[in-house]
């Protein structure tokens, strides 16, 4: 069984590396990086040229179903970035499928005024 787990982990890491090779953020257009655990979802806006996180939001303290919380997280990160005068972002979904919570977070960010 550990060999199968190792193979899945290798495939996941390969997807992450492939995605990161294509996606890079700057101060004008930061990378919106998504992290999803079994209970929570978080997102941070990263300027890769400097290596600095501009803003970060997670769903701790929010109520509702996971997809609804992800939508709210998207709206919150959009509001924080618009305060910083950032409207354009690059969406980095990492190895997660663009479905469910990840899609809902992206939709919330768009609803908040961000452009991908």
What are these regions (language model features)?
Residues 2-116:
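Ribosome large-subunit tunnel/peptidyl-transferase-proximal elements
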